[in-house]
Curated annotation (Swiss-Prot):
GO molecular function: 3'-nucleotidase activity; 5'-nucleotidase activity; exopolyphosphatase activity; metal ion binding; nucleotide binding
Record lineage: Bacteria, Pseudomonadati, Pseudomonadota, Gammaproteobacteria, Enterobacterales
Organism: Shigella dysenteriae serotype 1 (strain Sd197)
Name the record gives this protein: 5'/3'-nucleotidase SurE
Keyword set, alphabetical order: Cytoplasm, Hydrolase, Metal-binding, Nucleotide-binding
Keyword Cytoplasm included in the entry's annotation: yes
Family: Belongs to the SurE nucleotidase family.
Any matching Pfam family: SurE
Chief localization: cytoplasm
InterPro entries: SurE, SurE-like_Pase/nucleotidase, SurE-like_sf
Keyword tRNA processing recorded: no
Domain of life: Bacteria
Length: 253
């Protein structure tokens, strides 16, 4: 199995390094990751400037000023030959639950892989300690995929409780919950008296009931949520069409 491994925490982050070490025990792994933390970069792609790369002695590649999406784009189309069999993103330091997936560079890297037609996993740890647990879970899933491919055409967003492996209760297939909208802005002044702004933490849990990714992780289970690239709200198409006709906009041209 050939794995393109990326993340949004940066090439030296403990999550990606722990996962790379574990994956290399049974797979051919190419790390292509940002040279710094790009958390919250979502699906941003660098189009107005060139990208430089640096290759470390162990073969890991850092994309200087690159986003997670840049890294997977370059990895698939230029840096990994032959091309990968699967794209894996993570292990993220902290969860990507509910609305987090909209902003997450970790999920975006997996989404870019899926966009190119590859199976893709996004892996996050609900904390900053037990990366070995998340790595073991990921390896188990990938070994299973080797034996029996999962032909859903979907991204698997995997969130792992920050627990020792022997305390993980199992795996649940979940849906995304939701958070309350975040509204905290933290102002500061620089030495010249100019105001600086920091975006605050994410909103608290809103929909975290049974069946959600929040609930599974809170209860000690690994959460796996299938995600899709197509954002079309198919069930709303007829509603929008009927509304356009009823207000007369749909018949103006």
């Amino acid at each position: 199995m050939r794995i393109l491994l990326s993340n949004d925490d940066g090439v030296h982050a403990p999550g990606i390094q722990t996962l790379a070490k574990a994956l290399r025990e049974f797979a051919d792994v190419q790390v292509v990751a940002p040279d710094r933390n790009r958390s919250g970069a979502s699906n941003s792609l660098t189009l107005e400037s060139s990208l430089r790369t640096f290759t470390f002695e162990n073969g890991d590649i850092a994309v200087q000023m690159g986003t997670p999406t840049d890294c997977v784009y370059l990895g698939v189309n230029a840096l990994m030959r032959p091309r990968p069999d699967i794209v894996v993103s993570g292990i993220n330091a902290g969860p990507n639950l509910g609305d987090d997936v909209i902003y997450s560079g970790t999920v975006a890297a997996a989404m870019e892989g899926r966009h190119f037609g590859f199976p893709a996993l996004a892996v996050s740890l609900d904390g900053h300690n037990h990366y070995d647990t998340a790595a073991a879970v990921t390896c188990s899933i990938l070994r299973a995929l080797c034996e029996e491919p999962l032909r859903t055409g979907r991204i698997l967003n995997i969130n792992v409780p920050d627990l020792p492996l022997d305390q993980i209760k199992g795996i649940r297939v979940t849906r995304c919950g939701t958070r309350h909208p975040a509204d905290q802005v933290i102002p500061q002044q620089d030495p010249r008296g100019n105001t600086l702004y920091w975006i605050g933490p994410p909103g608290g849990k809103c929909d975290a009931g049974p069946g959600t990714d929040f609930a599974a992780v809170d209860e000690g289970y690994v959460s796996i949520t299938p995600l899709r690239v197509d954002l079309t709200a198919h069930s709303a198409q007829d509603v929008v069409s009927d509304w356009l006709n009823s207000v007369g906009v749909g018949t103006q041209w």
